[in-house]
Amino acid sequence: MGKNVVVLGSQWGDEGKGKIVDLLTEKASAVARFQGGHNAGHTLVVDGKTTVLHLIPSGILREGVTCFIGNGVVLAPDALLKEMKGLEENGVPVRERLRISPNCPLIMPYHVALDQAREAKRGSGKIGTTGRGIGPAYEDKVARRAIKLADLFRDDLEEKLRNLIEYHNFQLTQYYKVEAIDFDETLKLCKEWKEEIRGMVTDVTEDLNQLRLAGKNLMFEGAQGTLLDIDHGTYPFVTSSSVTAGGVSTGTGIGPLYLDYVLGITKAYTTRVGSGPFPTELFDDVGAHLAKVGHEFGATTGRARRCGWFDAEALRRAVVLNSMSGICLTKLDVLDGLEELLIGVGYNLPETECAGAHDAEFYEAVTPKYETLQGWSESTVGITNYDELPENAKIYIKRIEALIGCPVDIISTGPDREETIVLRDPYDA
């Protein structure tokens, strides 16, 4: 029988999921995205060549791997076609390898306009969205008025679209005081999208299930990170989808008992893009060092990432939320040369009448408890054998394992897929 492996972020995103998915797809027959949209940014480095993917699963570069976009993803057809074009220009046969659920809600021009108008109106209180229409698209889905990919092929598309544009234009022009979205232009776009995407639409749930029954290895690729989950993250500074392992089943239709292994991708320190609380954030030279050496700039937005010490307490919670089987520790090499390393081992909690919130107010109010470990001067860049790691690096890894109650199964020591230590392969676990 094959194995079904989930790969997801365990912090605030940007943990290095793309590289690990690309690495592990050597043993997978299919890779499926199950949530989010083109707000994700997965960077792959293969033989020194960098590819950034926002919507298409990271397995697309592997010959013989089928990539699926599940119903939990909000689909921006214009972004998809642009990404496809870039890959095809580099010789990747995307149309042969990519399949898309007809149940994906579409990100329309009015969603992008709403997203950007809302952020502008919030001023200093902005959430820090990517401005790509993700939130408003999920909003329409939950309100049961979304235009889904399937609607492009149905006779009532024009009526649905006209009603929706009228509804959203009222908000845009009357409340946000910005330009209205043109109906005719949007309808024309929909007709173009239909023809471009037609050959890739499929019943993703059934296709994945048939692969499972045939004993094939499957992979489910998460976007963003656990602490950005709509339910379990630092609300309201979160994304609009279910980022945790539970989102796999709702976002693809593959039931939870069919999932064999959950891998949490985790940086050896902590980063966050945009607004929101960050208990272990650094504002000193060490924070600047992590940002510089770690090249901490968002693949989607280009925004500088905030950097801080490893937060073991936040990760311990992520392990529980996702029932993680193991973690992959990335960017260990960024810590090379630091004399001391601090780990956030817990929080000093404020008095409250409402325990267990774990939202933005909770994380703003806590102060971290730190434990200090000795760093290492040796380079870990490109090491592929655990025994070759500096002794203090091993101590750091073992301490993390003890604090979070989960084994470190993979260690990344550089951006290339080959610069990796695999202690336990998820497909062999």
From Swiss-Prot:
GO terms for biological process: 'de novo' AMP biosynthetic process; IMP metabolic process. Its main location: cytoplasm. One of its GO terms (molecular function) is GTP binding. InterPro entries: Adenylosuccin_syn_GTP-bd, Adenylosuccin_syn_Lys_AS, Adenylosuccinate_synth_dom1, Adenylosuccinate_synth_dom2, Adenylosuccinate_synth_dom3, Adenylosuccinate_synthetase, P-loop_NTPase. Substrate binds at residues 299-305. Pathway: Purine metabolism; AMP biosynthesis via de novo pathway; AMP from IMP: step 1/2. IMP binds at residues 14-17, 39-42, 130, 144, 224, 239, 303. It comes from the Bacteria. Mg(2+) binds at residues 14, 41. It holds the Pfam family Adenylsucc_synt. Keywords: Cytoplasm, GTP-binding, Ligase, Magnesium, Metal-binding, Nucleotide-binding, Purine biosynthesis. It catalyses: IMP + L-aspartate + GTP = N(6)-(1,2-dicarboxyethyl)-AMP + GDP + phosphate + 2 H(+). One of its GO terms (cellular component) is cytoplasm. It is found in: Cytoplasm. Its EC number is 6.3.4.4. Belongs to the adenylosuccinate synthetase family. PANTHER family: ADENYLOSUCCINATE SYNTHETASE (PTHR11846:SF0). Plays an important role in the de novo pathway of purine nucleotide biosynthesis. Catalyzes the first committed step in the biosynthesis of AMP from IMP. Homodimer. This is Adenylosuccinate synthetase. The lineage of its organism: Bacteria, Pseudomonadati, Pseudomonadota, Gammaproteobacteria, Moraxellales.
